């Protein structure tokens, strides 16, 4: 009985000793992991305090964004800002990204849960190759746990690159809400003040004769300008903040018309406005040719010019519509 008791005591002692020996490396590894994580967070916080958007090369990206351990998310903008790249959209997107990062850095809700970083192609081309990335700018959220999923890549062509739109996307992916605070822009109030001053000056100069306020042609022209601006998608641009155009970084080809029906470029708005204006001018000429008291020769010229404008610009408008709504069966002169 005593021998059996000694056997059990020795067995229990050996098991406990074995567990302690095995736990020592595990605890040591855990402490080392926590130290590495603490160093990474401290480094990121130090850089963020100096500059809200951290510039990264390949080494920094692999060490601080890709390599574990990590308990923070990193929003990375992949871009090409060097002048010889001639990426106008990259500069515009960078300005919005800086506004967003500054809004987060100087907000009362600022924590180390999320950081903003930037990788320029000329400083980290190996990162672009590692991620098989062939366009810029691109925004990707690298979450605290796991690899980026499909939704962690920002849909720039659909949402645009305004700071407010990127902030909504970040809130969806990280549950971190950022209130965008833009620096004051005095251009709008100045233009409004100038417009009011001009109108006030005209009213003052013509105070003895106010018939110009009831001029049908003036009001019709103002209404037409407003309609052309609204039907061309100007309000959509104001809300979404899309890029002016898109330049392929590899071929250098510039696209002014977006290939999807869910988005558009600012240049596309100007083109559509021009085409609508051309059709409108053609219709006005046709109406004048039919109702004017001018001689028959001038009326014929106006009629031919009006038909030409309507046919040409409507055909161009329809071709743009076909390029955006794939499968649309109808065309006119141009496919």
Curated annotation (Swiss-Prot):
Keyword Signal: yes
Similarity-based family: Belongs to the OST3/OST6 family.
Record membrane topology: Multi-pass membrane protein
Membrane topology, Cytoplasmic segments: 206-209, 292-300
Free-text function comment from the UniProt entry: Accessory component of the STT3B-containing form of the N-oligosaccharyl transferase (OST) complex which catalyzes the transfer of a high mannose oligosaccharide from a lipid-linked oligosaccharide donor to an asparagine residue within an Asn-X-Ser/Thr consensus motif in nascent polypeptide chains. Involved in N-glycosylation of STT3B-dependent substrates. Specifically required for the glycosylation of a subset of acceptor sites that are near cysteine residues; in this function seems to act redundantly with TUSC3.
Transmembrane segments: 185-205, 210-230, 271-291, 301-321
Name of the protein this chain belongs to: Dolichyl-diphosphooligosaccharide--protein glycosyltransferase subunit MAGT1
Matches recorded under PANTHER family: DOLICHYL-DIPHOSPHOOLIGOSACCHARIDE--PROTEIN GLYCOSYLTRANSFERASE-RELATED (PTHR12692), MAGNESIUM TRANSPORTER PROTEIN 1 (PTHR12692:SF2)
Places the protein is found: Cell membrane; Endoplasmic reticulum; Endoplasmic reticulum membrane
Effect of residue 324 to N: In CDG1CC; no effect on protein expression; decreased protein N-linked glycosylation of STT3B-specific substrates
Xref: SUPFAM superfamilies: Thioredoxin-like (SSF52833)
Entry-listed glycosylation sites: 71
Pfam families: OST3_OST6
Disulfide topology: 87-90
Tissue: Ubiquitous. Expressed at very low levels in brain, lung and kidney.
Sequence ranges assigned to domain Thioredoxin in this UniProt record: 47-175
Listed pathway(s): Protein modification; protein glycosylation
Extracellular side: 30-184, 231-270, 322-335
Assembly and oligomerization: Accessory component of the STT3B-containing form of the oligosaccharyltransferase (OST) complex. OST exists in two different complex forms which contain common core subunits RPN1, RPN2, OST48, OST4, DAD1 and TMEM258, either STT3A or STT3B as catalytic subunits, and form-specific accessory subunits. OST can form stable complexes with the Sec61 complex or with both the Sec61 and TRAP complexes. The association of TUSC3 or MAGT1 with the STT3B-containing complex seems to be mutually exclusvice.
An example Gene Ontology biological process: cognition
GO MF annotations in UniProt: magnesium ion transmembrane transporter activity
Keywords assigned by UniProt, alphabetized: Cell membrane, Congenital disorder of glycosylation, Disease variant, Disulfide bond, Endoplasmic reticulum, Glycoprotein, Magnesium, Membrane, Signal, Transmembrane, Transmembrane helix, Transport
Disease per record: Immunodeficiency, X-linked, with magnesium defect, Epstein-Barr virus infection and neoplasia: A disease characterized by CD4 lymphopenia, severe chronic viral infections, and defective T-lymphocyte activation.
């Amino acid at each position: 009985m005593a021998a059996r008791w000694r056997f059990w005591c020795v067995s229990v002692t050996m098991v406990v000793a074995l567990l302690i020996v095995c736990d020592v490396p595990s605890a040591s590894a855990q402490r080392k992991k926590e130290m590495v994580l603490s160093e990474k967070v401290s480094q990121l916080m130090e850089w963020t305090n100096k500059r809200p958007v951290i510039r990264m090369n390949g080494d920094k990206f692999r060490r601080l964004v890709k390599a574990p351990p990590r308990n923070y998310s990193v929003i990375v903008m992949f871009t090409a800002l060097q002048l010889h790249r001639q990426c106008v959209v990259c500069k515009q997107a960078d300005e919005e990204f800086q506004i967003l990062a500054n809004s987060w850095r100087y907000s009362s809700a600022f924590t180390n849960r999320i950081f903003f970083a930037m990788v320029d192609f000329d400083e980290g081309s190996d990162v672009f190759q590692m991620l098989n990335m062939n366009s810029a700018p691109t925004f990707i959220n690298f979450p605290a746990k796991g690899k980026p999923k499909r939704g962690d890549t920002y849909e720039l062509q659909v949402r645009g690159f305004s700071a407010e739109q990127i902030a909504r996307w970040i809130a969806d992916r990280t549950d971190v809400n950022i209130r965008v605070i833009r620096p004051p822009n005095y251009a709008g109030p100045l233009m409004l003040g100038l417009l009011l001053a001009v109108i006030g000056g005209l009213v003052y100069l013509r105070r003895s004769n106010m018939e110009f306020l009831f001029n049908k042609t003036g009001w019709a022209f103002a209404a037409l300008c407003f309609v052309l601006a609204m039907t061309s998608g100007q309000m959509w641009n104001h809300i979404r903040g899309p890029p002016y155009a898109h330049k392929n970084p590899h071929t250098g080809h510039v696209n002014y018309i977006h290939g999807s029906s869910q988005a558009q470029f600012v240049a596309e708005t100007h083109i559509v406005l021009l085409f609508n204006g051309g059709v409108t001018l053609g219709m006005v000429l046709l109406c004048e040719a039919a109702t004017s008291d001018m001689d028959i020769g001038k009326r014929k010229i106006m009629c031919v010019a009006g038909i030409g404008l309507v046919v040409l610009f409507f055909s161009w408008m329809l071709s743009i519509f076909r390029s955006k709504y794939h499968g649309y069966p109808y065309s006119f002169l141009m496919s």
